[in-house]
Amino acid sequence: TRSLTNFIRDKGAPKGTISNNNKGDFNLKKLINNSIKWPGLNGLDLAKIVTTKKKYLWKGFKTWKKEKGFEKNKKKKYKIVAIDYGIKKNILRYFSNFNCEVTVVPCGLEAEDIIKLKPDGIFLSNGPGDPAAT
């Protein structure tokens, strides 16, 4: 996996097709043609597809303490707005561990609407696709 990650980082995402057939019968010409015709990720804004459709307050996991397990969340000290470009739940859990109340918003939300939430901080999540497209 690391080798593939390094390859993609250095040379970009290659064209390829993954196929499965229980009998082992493959139309290689068709599979190769599918790969050649694939337009790639350049200019693709996948964040619009994976972002949350509406704003929500994340109420996920309780705080984890070594030797004690999960504890009740303490009163939240900081208000964070997380702009969802494909956010991972683990990131939200980390914020919770640092006593943050996290409001997750769609990636297309206007700046004025984010400011109205009066956050102590704004987090832009990572996401899929071409960063230049988002």
Predicted regions span which residues?
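RNA-binding accessory domains that recognize and position tRNA/RNA substrates
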Residues: 1-118, 131
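Structural motif
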Residues: 121-125
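Glycine/threonine-rich flexible loop motifs
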Residues: 128-134
